[in-house]
Amino acid sequence: MRSEKVEFSGSQGAVLAARLELPEYEPRAYALFAHCFTCGKDQVAATRISRALTEFGIAVMRFDFTGLGGSGGDFGNTHFSSNVDDLVFADEYLRAHFEAPTLLIGHSLGGAAVLAARHRIPRIRAVATIAAPSAPTMCCTCSGATGRR
């Protein structure tokens, strides 16, 4: 396995920090991993899951959402929709520089974000969530933000 630091522009124009875990040989597939609320790409579980997937030939890019970890931008100006948009920008980066992802993985609020983004990322064949709301609308319902972005 090898690991590369990468950067790409996010939905609000900030530079987002990412790490691409690659298998030793040509990847069979690419995946995007979305971390939990206020976590980051280097969270232990995200790192272990990403590296384990490389053993099965899956390259995984995990990144810090706008304003978190090594990414630029102001976290105070972000919201659920901007996280979903950051995922779409991550997809565009992977498609332009490597290969389109076919798998989305999300933990907690990142899981809700991948569920919301899946229809905007054209080649997705599978979505995996870990401890996530079953639908993005659950986040809004619980917070009282139903009907808002």
What does each model-identified segment do?
Residues 5, 13-16, 103, 112, ...:
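The alpha/beta-hydrolase serine catalytic core
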Residues 37-50, 65:
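The serine-hydrolase catalytic nucleophile loop
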Residues 1-26:
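N-terminal cap/lid segment of alpha/beta-hydrolase-fold proteins
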Residues 96-108:
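Alpha/beta-hydrolase fold nucleophile elbow
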Residues 50-72:
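Conserved alpha/beta-hydrolase
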Residues 41-42, 68-99:
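Catalytic nucleophile-loop/oxyanion-hole region of alpha/beta-hydrolase
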Residues 28-36:
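Short beta-strand element of the alpha/beta-hydrolase
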